[in-house]
Structure formats: C-alpha cells, structure tokens
Amino acid sequence: MDVISDGEWRRIHYLDEFLLRVGGHERARRFKHNDEVKTTLVVTGKMQRGDPLFVDEAEFLVKHTDCCTKFALPSPFLIAIRKWHEDYSSDAYPTMEHYMEHLTELLALEARALAQTGIDIIQLDDPALTYLCDRRLTEQGQTQDDRLKREWDIDRQAPQAIAAINQIAGELPVEVQLHCCHSVHKRQSDVKGDYKPILPFLQDAKIDRVNLEFAYQGTGESDDLTLLPEGIGVGMGVVDVRNENIQTVEGIELIGAAGAAIIDPSRIALNPDCGFAPDYGEPPSIDEAYEKLCNLTQAAARLRERFAD
C-alpha cells in the first residue's frame, strides 16, 4: 500500500461526524430511502467555529506510519444537497447557498489545520457531483432517495460545487484529491452513470487527482478518461466494495490496463471504488477488506512492471 488513512473505523458517519461537531443540526427530517423510512440530520441553527475537529485523528495517523497519508473530508456541495431543507433550515440559512458558503469556510479552516499535522493528501468526498451523472435522476427525477428529489442543473451546480472545492483546496500546501463515488449505502449504489457529464467541469478544479469508480456496471467507463483534464491524475476504483465477492488479481489488472491504454499510465493510481469504513449501513468484515486490498496491491505491482519505462 502506497497511501493509507486511519481506516475511519472510528467514525459514526462521514457527514455526521463533522456536522455533530460544528453544531446547528438536528435529527428531524424524515425521508424514504430504498423503501426504508429514516430520520436524518438537517441544519436548523447556525454552525459554530471552534477548535479544529480532526487534528487528533490526523496526528495519530502521522505518528504511526512512515507511509504517505491521506485524510478525507466531506465536500460543501454534498452536505448542502443532503442537509439543507427549506422547511427546517431557512431561519438559520435563508438559502442552500448561504449554508454552503458557511460550510466552505469551516471546511477550509479544517483542511488547513489537517495540513499542518503532516498529512500528505487531503481528499474531499463528493458523491453529489456524481448525482449529476445519473440521467434518470437529472432528467426524469427517478430516485430511491427522497433527498434527491429536487431540480438538477449541471451547468449551474457543477461550477458551484467546484468553486467551493477550490476555496478549500486553493492554498493548501499538500496534495488535494476529489472522490466521486456513486453514493454506496448498505452495499447498494444510489445513482448510476458514467462520468462523462462532469469530467469537463474539472478543468477549473484545483485538485491533483480525482478518484472514480470503475469496478462494476453503471459507474465509470474507461473511455471516460478521454475527457480527463490535463494535469489531473485519476484514481481508478478497481475493487467493488458493495458485496463479498473477491475480485481476482487478473480482473483488477484488466480494469487498470484499460485505463492505461487511454491515458499515460503515470497518471493512474488504483484504489477501491469506495470506502470500507462502517456507518449506518452494513460494513464489510476486516477479513474481506484485507483480502480485497491484497489483490489490489498485487494487481498494481503487475501493472507497474507491465508499463515500466
């Protein structure tokens, strides 16, 4: 493994962990997700700036490894899409854009604090950008998640999301990556679609790498990489985390090689499609995650040898 995180097994949920610490959110909004009625956090009051939230976790990671380290934060656009609702939030933040502006400010402060701990890579997680790739959702309003029933406009929302990312990433002295998965929950994906709709918008993104999913149908396609802007690398998600099936080394290598046939192999890294960390869903076992990562590293070694200069 060339890059590691702390695994995030400490967390409650990759959004809620942040939101519960900044305050202003209540578990009050009921919605239906895959025929299951849930109650989610929604912003109802002003968030508060305080001490950095995740410095202790980052320092622990840096202290216990000599490897390149990564720490992930949720993106402002993702949080705003899911956690602002006019029926609950308007008194605190009149519009979703007001909420998103404050989120961006708080996350920029957090990212700068993390960079000072010695973390090498800061990743912003933004499945909401991938929502814009699902034509069924954006054109027909088809979704299993009530929170996504809204007006979608890629020409307005993609630049909005990237502007927020740039405010966070712009002056960081570390590598910045963007992760766009298909919103995996309980081993199911909320949306489907290749990445062709959003990749051209990354031309203006102040990121070093974008991490995408390619391991199962309904996600990325290798020819998506023809639209990857110059100067940005790609993390090809080549391991499916949604089920217990263990992909072979050869199968993983095949996906990576398809990408290397389109762009310079030096621009490609391999990674799992999405995270193995638990949340309110059904996490994989440690043994499953370990075996999948072992096959991933073997495939990466074979590809390095295959495409060596």
What are these regions (language model features)?
Residues 1-309:
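Domain-level signal for soluble alpha/beta catalytic cores
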